[in-house]
Amino acid sequence: MTSTSSATRPNQKDLEKLVDETPASGPKRSIAFLAGVATFGSLLFGYDTGVIAGALPYMYMPRIAGGLRINEFQEGLVGACLALGAAIGAIAGGRLSDHYGRRHNILLLAGIFILGTLGCTFAPNIAVLYLFRFILGIAVGGASATVPVYLAESAPTRVRGSLIALDQFMIVAGQLLAYSMNAILSSAHGGPQVYVTEDPSGTLTGGQWYPWDQVQNVSSAVITAGDGMAWRWMLVLATIPAICLWLGMRLMPESGRWYASKDRYYEAIGALKRIRDPKLDNLSEEIAQIAELQQREDAQGHWSLRRTASVAWTRRLLLIGVGLACFDQLTGINTAMYYLPKILAAAGFSAADSITLNVITGAVACAGAGFGLYLVSKLARRHVG
């Protein structure tokens, strides 16, 4: 038995018998291990959105010094391309995960993360960087739509709230990791520096290394080398968690809830048995609840956006959700996330110090998310909100 049709969906007795007779579909995995692997997708979300803050100061440097000689307009597009890709990825990611499964979609996204990261790392010019930042954005958006759903559907009720909060924590942890690696690499190189061979104006002494901050406004300086390649090292480090995500998800089961949505209860039970503790979790009761919920959803039919907006209680939920998302964006946090080193540099800090100080914002965000994770583990999610 591998699947059932909606017309012959098993009843309570059939489900109990199926639970007794169905073996686990593979090796047992703890829910902590599953969450740790799946949230590599969230970590990548955070890393790829945060890493650009430290990379941009190096991209401003001339090509001979390892940079891309970008201007302010191009700097804005580097961030915008990822955001555009993320918007498309979030929509497409949800649809693909509904059709092909959460696990399969995360595996696909891991591959896109690797492709996008390597494409950005080895981009020979700004146009190619735009393209692969857009591709990377698709993976970021897809992860934001798929990973929380996979966690929610895989987690037992007793820890579901905490695991969903863990997703958000790992996003800001990824940003902190990006800021930290940016600071480490920048410090190792001594900050953005160029080698000036000569300067006919006499402003600079030839044959010396100078901070890029000091040289960028001296048009007569002849630059022959620099440490601008540091931005490529910052970006390529994201391949490590992406590979871990791809390898780890190959060891994980598909979402049992997704199997049930396709009336494949045999596979659903087999998948859930891999990640449930028989001493703590009542699988018969859980699968019965899933089947009941699926019947209700089938009876309600498809909920379009128009239908959601026309019903009072769903309209209220929609407005609250959209309002919170808009408020989050209007706070300007994305500006700080992408451009804080530039803002600090404009305030008088050196480029190297600005990249290092950015770690503080990541640490504060991580502490806040950690506190939220603690509250969710102690209180109801609605009360925390």
Task: Please describe what each predicted stretch is.
Residues 2-277, 282-285, 291-385:
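Transmembrane-helix signature of 12-pass secondary carriers
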